[in-house]
Swiss-Prot record:
It is an enzyme of class 6 (ligase). GO terms for biological process: cell division; cell wall organization; peptidoglycan biosynthetic process; regulation of cell shape. A motif (L-lysine recognition motif) lies at residues 406-409. It comes from Staphylococcus aureus (strain NCTC 8325 / PS 47). Carboxylation is probably crucial for Mg(2+) binding and, consequently, for the gamma-phosphate positioning of ATP. GO terms for molecular function: ATP binding; magnesium ion binding; UDP-N-acetylmuramoyl-L-alanyl-D-glutamate-L-lysine ligase activity. This is UDP-N-acetylmuramoyl-L-alanyl-D-glutamate--L-lysine ligase. It is found in: Cytoplasm. Belongs to the MurCDEF family. MurE subfamily.
Length: 493
């Protein structure tokens, strides 16, 4: 596309140079800028990428978007705008032909449950033989092809490119995990949502948002801003078991479908049966009651299942067809995932990293604990520490507790575990400043019949260490290796 045509979509302060050049790429990553690219510089929390403008010029890039004039060669056109990231969003959606308009887009937000609900929607679509894409905490996936991701919600240009990639691959739908950070930072500007789903709201990310009111407002942006294409039918799916849903009803102009277990809703789960092999329940709907079985474990996953089923149903698939698909879904990686059932202990990993998430996790596993419940939990560095003692208190519902850091970054690991220990309600706990050693200790003290839960990370493949360096780390692999060494079995894949 000609740059002069592209920039007709935005208001600029001034242009230094010529816009008569062909553009086939937009990037906010200076390392990928090249001839034919537009490089959009921005002022981030830790890095001002304006300082890389000369680098991109050396790589052949001839057009940059900046918030003030840079010292660059005369053959590099500079477009000066007040808000570079807002302009990046407009340019990306325009250049890539508004990809979110070309498929059904589901957006899932909430403190806990985003990954599970989003993954379930994607897996249901695949069971229905539909081409589908997913983008979130577990990376980027088109059908069964997966790639890793850095953030739950990537920055606006990368996000738009991923949606375009899904469209080009023939995806009929795409499910996005929508983080509060992504909403506040404008990463989702221009994305057209067909269905918005809310799981719950509990304390988290106050290091970023400051207050629960601000955090809640951030989440509400998804429901008030589903997009601008009024020709599409749009729907909102709300969890009536969470009181924040009442507020979300007031901010959305779209039709709402509610689900719940404890509170009255349009769609409800009754006669619930649970085991470590899965759940079953009667799905009570406005159209009748349907028996549902699922391999997912825990009462909280029943809420997630209902949210996913309603979302897919809202776009035209019958409930009977969806329920058949749900019965055969694969587990969501790292979400109440039982590792190697042949072991004499129940070894479980989960992503729970808030007091609410941990409570629900313990509620799910405690009825099936045969001997002791050994619970390992970590606290992340450079995060809201006001929630930490409550996490320690909840962890002490277990018989034995191990406190570790989780992505300590530049914080002192010993400080993080001490903050967790402030909430301890019994003395059966130990602190490790090395998470891997804490996991090995959990296995070392476990006896046949015990349940060992490794919480906070799921299958996250790294630890963020000082200097924000990512060091390879997998809870599941460390736990399995220690368990096989003690009890036999293996090897670790």
């Amino acid at each position: 596309m000609d740059a002069s045509t592209l920039f007709k979509k935005v208001k600029v302060k001034r242009v230094l140079g010529s816009l008569e050049q062909q553009i086939d790429d937009i990037t906010t990553d200076s390392r990928t800028a090249r001839e034919g690219s537009i490089f959009v510089a921005s002022v981030g929390y830790t890095v001002d990428s304006h300082k890389f403008c000369q680098n991109v010029a050396d790589q052949g890039c001839k057009l940059v978007v900046v918030n003030k004039e840079q010292s660059l060669p005369a053959n590099v056109t500079q477009v000066v705008v007040p808000d570079t990231l807002r302009v990046a969003s407009i340019l990306a959606h325009t250049l890539y032909d508004y990809p979110s308009h070309q498929l059904v887009t589901f957006g899932v937000t909430g403190t806990n449950g985003k990954t599970s609900i989003a993954t379930m929607i994607h897996l249901i679509q695949r069971k229905l033989q539909k081409n589908s894409a997913y983008l979130g905490t577990n990376g980027f996936q088109i059908n069964e092809t997966k790639t890793k991701g850095a953030n739950t919600t990537p920055e606006t240009v990368s996000l738009t490119k991923k949606i375009k990639e899904a469209v080009d691959a023939g995806a009929e739908s795409m499910t996005l995990e929508v983080s509060s950070h992504g909403l506040v930072l404008g990463r989702l500007r221009g994305v057209e949502f067909d269905v918005a789903i809310f799981s719950n709201l509990t304390q988290d990310h106050l290091d970023f948002h400051g207050t629960m009111e601000a955090y809640g407002h951030a989440k509400s942006l998804l429901f008030s801003q589903l997009g601008e294409d009024l020709s599409k039918e749009k729907y909102v799916v709300l969890n009536n078991d969470d009181s924040f849903s009442e507020y979300l009803r007031t901010v959305t102009p779209y039709e709402v479908f509610s689900y719940g277990i404890d509170e009255e809703a349009q769609f409800m789960a009754k006669n619930i049966q649970e085991s470590l092999q899965g759940v079953s329940f009667d799905f009570v709907t406005p159209f009748g009651t349907y028996p549902v079985k699922s391999p997912y474990v825990g009462k909280f996953n029943i809420s997630n299942i209902m949210a996913a089923m309603i979302a897919v149903w809202s776009k035209g698939t019958s409930l009977e067809t969806i329920i058949k698909a749900v019965e055969n879904l694969e587990p969501v990686e790292g979400r109440l995932e039982v590792l190697d059932p042949s072991l004499p202990i129940d070894l479980i990993i989960d992503y729970a990293h808030t007091a609410d998430g941990m409570n629900k996790l313990i509620d799910a596993v405690q009825p099936f604990v045969k001997q002791k419940l050994i619970f390992l939990v970590g606290m992340a560095g450079e995060r809201d520490l006001t929630k930490t003692p409550e996490m320690g208190r909840v962890a002490c519902r277990a018989d034995y507790v191990i406190f570790t850091p989780d992505n300590p970054a530049n914080d002192d690991p010993k400080m993080l575990t001490a903050e967790l220990a402030k909430g301890a309600t019994h003395q059966n706990y130990i602190e490790f400043d090395d998470r891997a050693e804490g996991i090995k200790h959990a296995i070392d003290i476990a006896e046949p019949g015990d349940t060992v839960v490794l919480a906070s990370k799921g299958r996250e493949p790294y630890q963020i260490m000082p200097g924000h360096i990512k060091v390879p780390h997998r809870d599941d692999l460390i736990g399995l290796e220690a368990a096989y060494k003690k009890f036999g079995g293996g090897p670790v894949d």
